[in-house]
Every structure is written in C-alpha cells, then in structure tokens.
Amino acid sequence: MTSTKFHSQPLFPCRQLTALLLPLIAEQALSVTIGLADTLMVSSVGEAAVSGVSLVDTFNTLMIQIMSALATGGAVVASQYIGHREEKNARASAAQILFILSVFSLAVAAVVVVGRHAILRGIFGSIDADVMRYAETYFLLSALSYPFIGLYNAGAALFRAQGNSKVSMMSSLVMNVVNIGGNAILIFGFGMGVLGAALASLISRAIACIAVLFLLQKPGCMLRIEGLAALRPNGRLIQRILRVGIPAGIENGMFQIGKLSVASLTSTLGTAAIAANAVANTTSTFLNIPASAVGLAVLTVVGQCLGAGEKEQAVWYARRLLLLAYAGAWIMNLSAFFFADKLALTLFHLSPEAQAMALQVMQWFNIFSIFFWPSSFTLPNILRAAGDASFTMSVSIVSMWVFRVGFCYLMVLCFHGQLLSIWMGMFLDWVFRSVCFMVRFVRGKWLEQHVI
C-alpha cells in the first residue's frame, strides 16, 4: 500500500499500517458482540425483554457516541502533536481528554440514575408495562457504567493516536469474554434475565477501563499521564480538543437524538417491529466492521501526516484507506445478502412476523451499504482528522433531520408506512451525506484546516 514514492519518507509503511488495521478490525468485531450477546441471550426471556434492552441501548448509544466524539477530539490533537514531534503537548492533551470525559460521564450517569423513569417515558411515551420494567432495570446499570465507558474510550483513542491498536483490541477481548461469560452465568445459571445482562456488561466495562488506564500509565507509554497535577484543566488544550470534539459530539449527539426520535416512532409499530428493529440493528452492525475499523485508523494516519506537514501523504493514505473500506463493505454485505442474513436470524427467538420484517430491512441494508456506508461514515473521519469537524457536523445534522427524521415521520404518520419506511429514511440520509463529504474531499477544502 505504500509503494508510491513521496518527497519524504513514508510515515506509515505497509507493515505498520497492517499492524494498525488488523487489531482495529478485531476490536470492532469484539465490541459489537456485547450488544449481540445481550440481545441474543436476553431473547430467551422474551420479546418484551429484547424490546426493553433495545430501547435503552438506543439512549446508551447516544451517550457512547458523544463520549467517543470527545475522545476523537483528544486523539486528533494528540496525533497531530505526535506527528509534529511535540511529545510534551501530546501528553498534556491526553491528560485533558481524561479530565473532560471524567467530568462529562459522571454528570450524565448521575442524571440518568435519578431520572431514568422520566427519561424513558419522555422519549418513548406509552409502552407496554413489561417493556418499561425491563428497560428501567437495564437503564440503571447502564448508567453506572458510563464513567467506565468514557475513560475506556479516552484511553483506547489515545493508544490508537500513537499507532498502537493492540491495547484496545486486547482490552476489548477481555471485556467481551467477561461479558459473555457473565451473561451465561447470570442469565441462564441464576435466571436473572435483563438484570443479569446489564450486570455482566457493567462488570466487563469496568475491567476494560481499569486495564486501559493501567497500561496508559506504564513508563514506556508516549502519552503517559505524569501525576494527578497533569489532570488540572488547561484552557488552551481543552479549547483545541473541543474544537474537534464539540462539533463531533454535537454531530453524534444530534444523530443519536434523531435515532431516538425514530426509535420512538418505531415503538408505535408494535412489539414485533421493535424486536425486528433491534435484531436488524445488532446483526447489521457486524457487516460494516472492516469499514468502521478503517474509520478509526484514518484518524491516526491522516492526523499524524498532517501534524508532520505531509499533506501529500495525507491525501494518498486517505484515498487508499477509503478504497479499503469499500472493499470490506462489498465483501461483508454481498456475503450477507446471499448467505448470512437468514442464518443470522435463526439465532434469535423471534415471532414469524418479526423475523420477516428483520430479514426485509437487512437485505435492503446490504444493498445500500455497499455503495454509501464508507463514504457516509469512514470518509468524514478523514475530514475530522484534519480538524474539519464543523463541516461534517453541519451536513450530518441537516441530513439527519430532513431524511432520517422528517422522511420517516412523513411515511409512518401520513402514509402508514411500516418498519422498512423508517430504514429507507436512513438510507436517504446516507446518500446525501456521501455526496456532500465526497465533494468536500475532492475539492481539498479539508486540507486548509488547522488543529495545532
């Protein structure tokens, strides 16, 4: 991948790039299994349990995406300082992102613990009593895990900024082994149902968080935090981190709020539609694991190239990595369309009605993913790595409210559309985002941004 001659030494030779990408693919595959294991094992309790977990996970994803966006801001700043050979500022930016995420995650956790019932009722309105009971149980323990998720995301992003993706992969492996083992023991061994699934996820996330923070403090780590004094707020660095993190956080937050609005709409279609949507969401996430991994890699690669002043290399690597993301999307989604979708659905205890709806939306997902997913989600990370987060935020917010929310509500409320209509709104969102991001990339405006 790095045979092209540059005016200077390639920053990411093929072996180094492979060493970055392969653990990221494994990490993404492992991280998805937490949601899959919960949904799969909880499905033995019944559709009401699956629906309750699904509704809460929609909100959980909102929080995780906002925290990931803030971590991305820190990773972009740290990677550019690393590329610029400013290790002191890189370490200082690492400390600041840990501070930011500690404060944010603790505040959100406190709000959810106190007001979880009001939040669920306000977002999803009137839902079945059994679904609400399961959702409240799962929501409480999910909230307690937010600080662990926040600090884990920060630590993992900082390791990736250094080009070390093995640490986050191994932490994800430990997290998944504990989660799946805990699910098996607590759900099937002790009959704890949704409570068991939530408790297993909480314990696994706490262990992963502790492991990443411990490794971040090892003497050989470039971004090691040098004492608690380093965690004191630094206005200059916080501003630089938030210049990327806030637009990305608003983008991800508004994106998930849009999904919450759509989830609320989905809940009006009945328990079968909620369960089908949950299973389709969980299984379809697997199909874009390679493209998601490339999306994480470009933050490190493009960030370090631009930090070193190598715009030519940044463009070259960005193009090749985007093509790699497309290759992964084609292989995964075509395989699923012809072979894997029906097999995947047999793993879940769905009613015939829910299974038919899930299969329908998954196959449409396969078709649109091979053309639009990488340019809609991998490509904007290239722009963010350059500090062009405000543009990606603006496009994503407009597209989400017009297509993902507006179109869906129009189809369901005015034309009595079903679950597929909601997913079609999502696909239109991808198309619009892809066009805007591709035009921005080709014109080169993203290269004019400054982070450090």
Model features per residue range: what roles?
Residues 1-24, 78-145, 189-246, 302-368, ...:
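Short alpha-helical transmembrane segments in multi-pass integral membrane proteins
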Residues 8-40, 44-45, 61-73, 77, ...:
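N-terminal transmembrane alpha-helices
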Residues 19-35, 141, 175, 204-208, ...:
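Transmembrane helical elements of multi-pass membrane transporters/channels
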Residues 29-51, 120-129, 185-194, 253-286, ...:
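Helix-terminus/linker motif at the lipid-water interface of multi-pass membrane proteins
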Residues 47-58, 135, 139, 198, ...:
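Small-residue hotspots at the loop-to-helix junctions and early N-terminal turns
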Residues 50-110, 149-168, 274-340, 373-395:
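Small-residue-rich hydrophobic transmembrane alpha-helices
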Residues 62-65, 179-183, 209-213, 286-289, ...:
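Hydrophobic transmembrane alpha-helices of multi-pass small-molecule transporters
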Residues 71, 141-160, 168-176, 197-212, ...:
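Short runs within selected transmembrane alpha-helices of multi-pass transporters and secretion channels
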